[in-house]
Amino acid sequence: MDRSGSSDFAGAAATTGRSNPAPWSDDKESPNNEDDSNEDDGDHTTPAKVTDPLAPKLANNERILVVSVTERTRETWGQKAEFLLAVIGFAVDLGNVWRFPYICYQNGGGAFLVPYCLFLIFGGLPLFYMELALGQFHRCGCLSIWKRICPALKGVGYAICLIDIYMGMYYNTIIGWAVYYLFASFTSKLPWTSCDNPWNTENCMQVTSENFTELATSPAKEFFERKVLESYKGNGLDFMGPVKPTLALCVFGVFVLVYFSLWKGVRSAGKVVWVTALAPYVVLIILLVRGVSLPGADEGIKYYLTPEWHKLKNSKVWIDAASQIFFSLGPGFGTLLALSSYNKFNNNCYRDALITSSINCLTSFLAGFVIFSVLGYMAYVQKTSIDKVGLEGPGLVFIVYPEAIATMSGSVFWSIIFFLMLITLGLDSTFGGLEAMITALCDEYPRVIGRRRELFVLLLLAFIFLCALPTMTYGGVVLVNFLNVYGPGLAILFVVFVEAAGVFWFYGVDRFSSDVEQMLGSKPGLFWRICWTYISPVFLLTIFIFSIMGYKEMLGEEYYYPDWSYQVGWAVTCSSVLCIPMYIIYKFFFASKGGCRQRLQESFQPEDNCGSVVPGQQGTSV
């Protein structure tokens, strides 16, 4: 699929040290060296016209770059839709289903949408757009990109990779829970519909019973805690117990699915996302139609949407809105950089940012209707108020919703499609997080890793699976929540703040805007430049400060964490955060030469031999 003829060398291009030079001019190979018939870069055997703003400028004493076809190309998405589905699939995750509806009704219902939309426009969307543009322009992952922006901040890339490992350790376990439920649903009677099972206790009681009290536990709750997790056999972090084999097998199956989706890069992932990104929407619509037809659904939806304007006076509402937008869109995890790096150079990433971020937020809103229609139904069945039915987090989708499904006709069918939806939502997000790390390391170490992607992905997933084994123990559910807070929860906020500062303050908004102009033909408007320079960094710093102040609240109140666990948690957080200052020290004192001024220049200015990755101007210096 050679686009430039059958010759081994497509031609030659000349460039100066600063005029769009080769991205791998330090003799590294392109990590994705397969030809790609889908990228229409034109025939580069003929020199570009001088009037072309992307054309290399010819001058005396320039070194000649021989552009090899295999080194000039980078694998691209088979279709534009594959990229959009991959981004949507990453952004729309389990949190859209179990977190947004809860914090929406908790923080004023319809009134919550005011700060939510404001933070989307002024905070989340500018960062989302930034990462898509950066990845598409520089066409590399979160490690290699920093030599073209601010070399001293390469530690941001290592921090992101470490955070992605922490996420892989617990997030796939949550998907494993859904897999367990899925297999348990293939029966004539759902196992959480009655209290006559071996794992039930004497406190078990049907939620529809008139004798149901606060001391009683529902069959669905006992199934989750005593059958799926068997958490009663452990004692939290103090004694987690052995690994539960059936749960470990479910999580292992998740890792197998992830491997065969990622081992070939965007060629394999691009095909998988057609199922994993679209299936949740089909199921959501089916569940919505079923939910609104249930008795009491209208009360649930009314509870969800009724605005309580007085709550907007509470600062917590605004902080929750900012946090939800940030973690929902997912900037800073390296995923948007990685996925957009496989786009064509002139792809309209601005339009993509608007489309995908809007779909993400609308999906959260739609999920609220699905959840609250069922919560209204459960309140009707139990003859109680909705606020006594709902739970936040995993309990909502693994206890309350299965509880509701068990009371419906055709409960087996509804259970199967619901947990299939959770699995596909989770898989898309874990694809994105792991692909960010894989792309980054393949780009940074192309000779060692890039050539052996299949083997590297296998070893990486095996390593993460082994590290995740403690989350599959009897006390693993506590560790899952612990890692969620201390792994990415706090660290990613600081990391993204430094990333934004590096791009907008060191690299410069003007230079970044010029990069966007090369791709799209026009510079970003004043609104975007103001957001990038001032509003977005303040947005990130504010969330980070308030998250540190309320980190114990993030852990929840269902389990009392021992004192030593807080020290371990902060060590986990610092392990990724410290990558940034440690690399700055390394770059300044050990990887730079000359006096203090020259070292600062080498550390905080883009390297001379690294510039924009313009199609047809990549190659190996000779």
From Swiss-Prot:
The keyword Transcription regulation does not apply. Keywords: Cell membrane, Disulfide bond, Glycoprotein, Membrane, Metal-binding, Neurotransmitter transport, Sodium, Symport, Transmembrane, Transmembrane helix, Transport. Residues 32-42 have a biased composition (Acidic residues). InterPro entries: Na/ntran_symport (IPR000175), SNS_sf (IPR037272). GO terms for cellular component: axon; axon terminus; neuron projection; plasma membrane; synapse. The chain crosses the membrane at residues 83-103, 111-130, 155-175, 245-263, 272-289, 325-342, 354-375, 408-427, 455-473, 489-509, 530-549, 568-586. The keyword Transmembrane applies. One of its GO terms (molecular function) is metal ion binding. Residues 1-53 are annotated as: Disordered. Residues 1-82, 587-622 are cytoplasmic. Glycans are attached at N211. It is a multi-pass membrane protein. Its main location: membrane. It comes from the Eukaryota. Na(+) 1 binds at G89, V92, L425, D428, S429. Disulfide bonds join C195-C204. It is found in: Cell membrane. Expression is specific to cell bodies in the ventral ganglion of the embryonic and larval nervous system. PANTHER family: SODIUM-DEPENDENT SEROTONIN TRANSPORTER (PTHR11616:SF279), SODIUM/CHLORIDE DEPENDENT TRANSPORTER (PTHR11616). NCBIfam families: Na_transp. This protein is the target of psychomotor stimulants such as amphetamines or cocaine. Terminates the action of serotonin by its high affinity sodium-dependent reuptake into presynaptic terminals. This is Sodium-dependent serotonin transporter. It comes from Drosophila melanogaster (Fruit fly). The gene is SerT.
